[in-house]
Amino acid sequence: PINDSARNFAKNIYGNATPKLITISRLDGRKSHQNIIMTVKNLLPKFPNLKYVSIGDGDERRNLEKLIIEFELEKNVELIFKSTEQEKVSLLEQSDVFVMPSVVYKKSVEGFGIAYIEAASYGKPSVGGIYGGEGDAIKSGKTGYLCNGNDLNAIYENLVKILSDEKYKQLGANALEFSKDFSWDKIIKN
């Protein structure tokens, strides 16, 4: 169970924001954080109370901090470089959508995508990229959507599709059910 301190941490980060987007990963060019941040800017007219939280640190940290300032997104985007496991889980639990539309970066692609399965285990739909292993972790149209992580319009459209339609709750329920296929018990049996 999540402790009160972690729950309060997440409530303080999100405040009254809605919708709440989250990414949990290294700040790496392959993870497409910069494109998510640019998409957040484009989503604000439709979702003015949106909050995007990214948990993790890495080589792209300075570039992302500059981008947030350049786009005046300090109130809408929060980069959390260190967190406890409880805080991370509480933020994920309180979020609406996991977003990490990864791209090919330095000839490297996303592997299996365990982060999407973790999000699914909390009933969160995901938006992921088309180039790596995300297709094994996200069933497009059922547990979230896959899109070209270099295409800001595709990221935008998929997030709007999830956030504007009550059906997104069904995507989360489907994701939760799908995540059970990745339990150790199931993996051992297969």
Model-predicted segments: where are they?
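Conserved donor-binding/catalytic core segment of Leloir-type glycosyltransferases
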Residues: I13-K31, I37-V40, V53
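Conserved acidic donor-binding segment of nucleotide-sugar-dependent glycosyltransferases
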Residues: K139-G141, Y145-L152, K161-E166
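A short, well-ordered alpha-helix in the C-terminal region of glycosyltransferases
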Residues: L44, A154, K167-D181
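Short acidic alpha-helix that forms the nucleotide-activated donor recognition element
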Residues: R62, T84-S95, S121, K139
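Acidic donor-binding loop of glycosyltransferase active sites
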Residues: E93-S108, K124
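Short hydrophobic beta-strand element within catalytic cores of glycosyltransferases
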Residues: Y116, S121, P125-G128, I138
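C-terminal alpha-helical cap of glycosyltransferases
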Residues: W184-N190
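Nucleotide-activated donor-binding/catalytic signature segment of Leloir-type glycosyltransferases, i.e.
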Residues: R62-Q86, V97
